[in-house]
Curated annotation (Swiss-Prot):
Matching PANTHER family: CHEMOTAXIS PROTEIN CHEW, CHEMOTAXIS SENSOR HISTIDINE KINASE-RELATED
CheW-like domain boundaries: 20-164
Localization per record: Cytoplasm
PROSITE patterns named among the record's database cross-references: CHEW (PS50851)
Protein name: Chemotaxis protein CheW
Gene that produces this protein: cheW
Length: 170
């Protein structure tokens, strides 16, 4: 069974006014997202998830990660995103990103892990007023990558304290 690397990175100041940090990037549907690596515990390939009766629709179930029970969240359902469309010959490279949010751990389902990138804080732009998919209140900013954008999520705003408490009690 693959457990993926446990990621332990810290922000590295590059210069007095130019702080660089790392983002774990992944695909959800047709969009590319990033999360500050400081909030990521590890990345795990798809495993068995046990459904939970009466859980919110966006909760896929729970996952046993080395004797620790982790709730698994489907951001497609939470934010009404389209599922990834796979062409013949495409390989599904999905799994979970295990996050540390407040004092809780939770997993989010991803369609495809991309890579870890270093980004300068000045490269992060405010999110556009009109953005499709995930609401602007959950977005830290966007980073231009060639002709497209990487949406940087703020994991501390994805769930309220009350929601995190409910997830911890599943």
């Amino acid at each position: 069974m693959y457990h993926g690397p446990t990621l332990h990175h810290r922000r590295v100041p590059m210069a007095v006014n130019d702080e660089q940090f790392q983002l774990v990037t992944f695909q959800l549907g047709e969009e590319l997202y990033g999360i500050d690596i400081m909030g990521v515990k590890e990345i795990v390939k798809v495993q068995d998830v046990r459904p939970i009766p009466c859980a919110p629709a966006y909760v896929e179930g729970i996952f046993n990660l080395r004797s620790e029970i982790i709730p698994i969240i489907n951001l497609h359902k939470r934010f009404h995103l389209r599922e990834a469309t796979l062409e013949s010959g495409d390989e599904y490279l999905g799994g979970f990103v295990i996050l540390n949010v407040e004092d809780s751990k939770l997993g989010i389902i991803i369609d495809r892990i991309a890579r870890v990138i270093a980004v300068s804080q000045e490269d992060v732009q405010s999110p556009p007023q009109v953005i499709t998919g995930i609401g602007a209140e959950y977005i830290h900013g966007v980073v231009r990558q060639g002709t497209s954008y990487l949406i940087v999520l703020d994991i501390h705003k994805l769930f309220s304290s009350k929601e995190l408490q409910k997830l911890a009690n599943l």
